[in-house]
A protein has these predicted regions:
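Short, charged, amphipathic alpha-helices and their helix-cap/turn boundaries
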Residues: 2-19
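Asparagine-centered polar/low-complexity signal
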Residues: 8, 23, 74-76
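Domain-terminus/edge residues, biased toward the C-terminal soluble/receptor-binding domains
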Residues: 16-17, 28-144
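Short beta-strands and strand-loop turn motifs
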Residues: 19-25
């Protein structure tokens, strides 16, 4: 509970007025909520932390428990597959559905896409790919 309070303090500091945390794990609770826009803002902030960015950008790694190796894999199906994807996080609860926050870097552009409430993993991935490809095909960076 104390950690969730710290999370709420950070949300206020970041100007996230439509976000409230109850638990650190994000499982369903009526008072635990956010918006796609505020998830994007939070992701932008979090990805500036090198340790966080490295963790969410790692496809797989081996950890040791009682001197026994155990491989853990990132559940973001786009990481290491779709050009420019550098992270971030999948999620699922019964109320939220299947969710995916993705950061992609291409052609001097850095975008964050948010998919919430997908029915299946396949839909979540397809919707994310469509958002990413649409954005990079329709928007360009210009020097002013």
């Amino acid at each position: 509970k104390e950690f969730a309070e710290l999370m709420n303090e950070k949300a206020i500091e970041l100007g996230l007025t439509n976000t409230h945390f109850v638990t650190p794990h994000g499982l369903d609770d009526a008072n635990h909520y956010t918006t796609a826009l505020e998830l994007a803002k939070l992701t932008d902030y979090a990805m500036d932390n090198e340790t966080f960015a490295k963790i969410v950008g790692t496809k797989s790694t081996t950890i040791y428990i009682n001197n026994q190796p155990r491989q853990i894999n990132n559940t973001n199906e786009l990481l290491g597959v779709l050009n420019g994807v550098v992270g971030v996080k999948t999620g699922f609860t019964n109320n939220a559905g299947r969710c995916l926050v993705t950061e992609t870097k291409r052609n001097n552009m850095d975008i964050i896409t948010i998919v919430l409430g997908a029915d299946t993993k396949k839909d979540r991935t397809k919707d994310s790919v469509n958002l990413i490809e649409y954005t990079f095909s329709k928007y360009k960076m210009y020097n002013l």
